[in-house]
Amino acid sequence: RQISGTILTRELKQHTSIKDVASDSGYFVKTYRELVEQVAKLSYLNKDYLLFFRGQANDYKNKAGKSTFYPTIYRSDYLTQQELDYRFDKLYSASKILAELFKKHKVEGQTELRRKKHIQWSILQHYEVTETPLIDVTQSIRVACSFAQLKNDQNTAFVYIFGLPYYTNRISINSEHDLINIRLLSITPPQALRPYFQEGFLVGTDDITNEYERK
């Protein structure tokens, strides 16, 4: 069966289109129930995709006026090559220290963590240790709403819905979409409870680079 394209709900079609969704203003809902209803409809209409959520206090636009979702390592109004190199050096140093600490304290999963950089980066990103090339998302609407309202003194908040390919492993690499999807619940040791409370996932591209022109 051919994979279908993204389908919007009737209400969303009256507000925007697939082509313009990134540049249009968000679809306003007044209640949590309204949000859940839209999510339920989107999930039903888009069976070929798994829905993930991200909550933010603000909608960050690029120069073209479109919503953007940059990993922390690439975020800056003006990011120089020198700063980017520094951030990657800091990431590699933090990864090495994390692996050493796991080994020292005999944390479960230490052997695999030392071998796989994406596991190292996922833990560093989720616990906000340093900038990484990954973005936090969740399968919980409630968690996304909580993050959208965290330290938010405005009257509005933003919850984004992403339709991503179904994951097949703990670390799923989709070469067709150049996408990595990491299920935190499956890679973090049981001592790390935050991913279980937040139903956390990390997503990024397989082609991770510190080349400024390609960021």
Regions found by a protein language model. Name each.
Residues 1-215:
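Catalytic-core elements of nucleic-acid end-processing and repair enzymes
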